[in-house]
């Protein structure tokens, strides 16, 4: 998976975005305890809808790769 979104792909956009973030986590570009980019930043960077960005981040949380810290944001989980 590349670092860009292919809007013509049969793979849903939120899954592509989650894959990009997952790769950044696994490759150490987003190390443990680092805050994930905000939804606004994801929308701007990848030209996706806000709901798409939220769904991608939720996937990472469900996979145990990210966690929400109330009042602070979403961070890469150290156990990733």
Language model: regions and residue ranges:
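Extreme N-terminal segment that seeds HTH/winged-HTH DNA-binding domains in transcriptional regulators
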Residues: 1-50, 55-67, 72, 78-80
């Amino acid at each position: 998976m590349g670092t860009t979104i292919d809007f013509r792909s049969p793979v849903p956009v939120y899954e592509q975005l989650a894959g990009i973030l997952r790769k950044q986590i696994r490759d150490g570009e987003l190390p443990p305890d680092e805050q994930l980019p905000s939804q606004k930043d994801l929308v701007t960077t990848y030209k996706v809808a806000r709901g798409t960005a939220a769904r991608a981040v939720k996937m990472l949380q469900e996979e145990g790769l990210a966690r929400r810290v109330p009042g602070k944001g979403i961070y890469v989980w150290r156990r990733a």
